[in-house]
Amino acid sequence: MVVLGSTGSIGKNALKIAKKFGVEIEALSCGKNIALINEQIQVFKPKKVAVLDPNDLNNLEPLGAEVFVGLEGIDAMIEECASNLVLNAIVGVAGLRASFKSLQRNKKLALANKESLVSAGHLLDISQITPIDSEHFGLWALLQNKTLKPKSLIISASGGAFRDTPLELIAIQNAQNALKHPNWSMGSKITIDSASMVNKLFEILETYWLFGASLKIDALIERSSIVHALVEFEDNSVIAHLASADMKLPISYAINPKLASLNASIKPLDLYALSAIKFEPISMERYTLWRYKDLLLENPKLGVVLNASNEVAMKKFLNQEIAFGGFIQIISQALELYAKKSFKFSTLDEVLELDKEVRDRFKNYR
């Protein structure tokens, strides 16, 4: 298999599962963590390696692997790889081209790059995609019973770092505080997206593309991150998917469903500890961006605007140029600006053109 973004949280766990399942790693790519990819090269001995920045080539130790550089290099690497499975864990819209290239080459796509579906779900062959996400894995598992007819799909949110912060103090919070997730430790982007509830807006759009636009789609807060998804059926019964909060579960099924079903990758649940489970609505007063949920479901191509404005805001927030209130304001202004526009793009280039337009419009925000 090919692992793109092998030095991130998803990539590292994917390599653990691949090793456990005896899956050969043909190719790896990374962003900036050259020291770690050098270690991975020693262990997995890939035939091909890609790095984003040519300035990192001097520190790369490929051990005879063919080396590719930049996003174009990743495309070329995918083109040349014989593997049938590509796991895309690149962060941000930078991973979009890799998703397209993988599907163009008729490869199965294990997709952790949310931005691919959020920005261009209408252009991707969903039948070849397995999402690497606890919530969507939960929905997939719940929908395997074809006798029951689903009515609504519900995914859970932890509430993020500011779920108990006094409302009047949320706007002045900085990135350091946003990165203090109460339940888990992952990358900075997804942790901040959890605090803003953008991550759940992304997952709502992913659910739309993956499981069908005809069903009602919603989310709720479940603080323990044990209930990942629920499905309500036409008979008014509801089934929930519970599991330890560990990404190795969806990763293992994306790599090899048969082996995953026979080999546990996560800890068993302590059922006696489940009495604390409680469901809460997502408050629009606390999570002001949640008010755009219905707008995005009505016009899912707005996902391009959501993602582009979020990446602009994220960079400014992490660079301490703006506080959390400014972060929210950039995304709100972008969605309000484009809310009534009709998008008819049918190519990747058109998606990237709108992405660039949104970034250019908000890059000088202060």
UniProtKB/Swiss-Prot annotation:
Keywords: Isoprene biosynthesis, Manganese, Metal-binding, NADP, Oxidoreductase. Belongs to the DXR family. It comes from Helicobacter pylori (strain G27). This is 1-deoxy-D-xylulose 5-phosphate reductoisomerase. It catalyses: 2-C-methyl-D-erythritol 4-phosphate + NADP(+) = 1-deoxy-D-xylulose 5-phosphate + NADPH + H(+). One of its GO terms (biological process) is isopentenyl diphosphate biosynthetic process, methylerythritol 4-phosphate pathway involved in terpenoid biosynthetic process. Mn(2+) binds at residues 133, 135, 203. Catalyzes the NADPH-dependent rearrangement and reduction of 1-deoxy-D-xylulose-5-phosphate (DXP) to 2-C-methyl-D-erythritol 4-phosphate (MEP). One of its GO terms (molecular function) is NADPH binding. InterPro entries: DXP_reductoisomerase, DXP_reductoisomerase_C, DXP_reductoisomerase_N, DXPR_C, DXPR_C_sf, NAD(P)-bd_dom_sf. It comes from the Bacteria. Its cofactor is Mg(2+); Mn(2+).
